[in-house]
Amino acid sequence: LDGKLARPPERPGLLHNYRKTGRLPPIYLMFIECSAVISTRLTLICHARTVAQKLARFPTNEPVENQPLKLGALATQFANASLLLCGPELRTRQTAEWFGAAPQVDAALRDCDWGRWHGQAIKDLQVHEADALQAWISDPQAAPHGGESVMQLGERVARWLTSLQGMPGHIVAITHPFVVRAALMQVMQGAAFNAVDVEPLSVVELRFNGIWRLRLPGIDLAGAL
């Protein structure tokens, strides 16, 4: 129902029967139950491109590469959002400022902890730590870099999603590719983590109305997201 209630069909005698028996028909109970569900809209936005992404390196706390020319146009995209969140890193805070003046930092949106691989090029790891890299790619519980495993990241993101379920309104969160992927895996209940690519400034929208659902926005031909 996407947060909207249709009017149940009128049938003669229903109210009379309710007054007599104290019971509502199942269709009325369904509408009452739907109206009690809090509707949460969550828009996840990946931070803008960084030099590390271009060079296929694990990230450091680096800035975004370029600033868009039309900042005003970006700010209007989610002007009516009830809450603007971002991860604590410089790149997420910079990107969040394009969409609103006062983003709120949420530590749960931080990037995966890459341990000693921070700043390391993947091509170098393929030479010097090939077995460790392969273990990390193939096993979500593996953390050969000494940081956070993919499974631990997923558990963190799952707790964060649960915390949002009682928050009505539209929440916009600027975060990292791996956090977005982990959120999608929680919603889809799938194991295809490595089959999802999250491009810089890509937008993913999730909605909670009893259960989390992935919503793929259409393209606005007038130029909006």
State what each model feature region is.
Residues 218-225:
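Acidic, His/Gly-rich catalytic cores of divalent-metal-dependent hydrolytic chemistry
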Residues 87-90, 108, 157, 171-178:
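Short, well-ordered beta-to-alpha junction loops that form the rim of enzyme active sites
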Residues 72-128:
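Phosphate-coordination/substrate-recognition cap region in phosphate-metabolizing enzymes
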Residues 131-152:
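Short glycine/proline- and acidic residue-enriched helix-loop micro-motifs
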Residues 69-71, 190-215:
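Domain-level recognition of soluble alpha/beta enzyme cores
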Residues 1-36:
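N-terminal amphipathic/basic-hydrophobic helices that include classical n-h-c signal peptides
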Residues 42, 82, 167-178:
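Generic beta-sheet signal
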Residues 40-95, 145-157:
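Loop-to-helix element that buttresses phosphate recognition and phosphoryl-transfer chemistry
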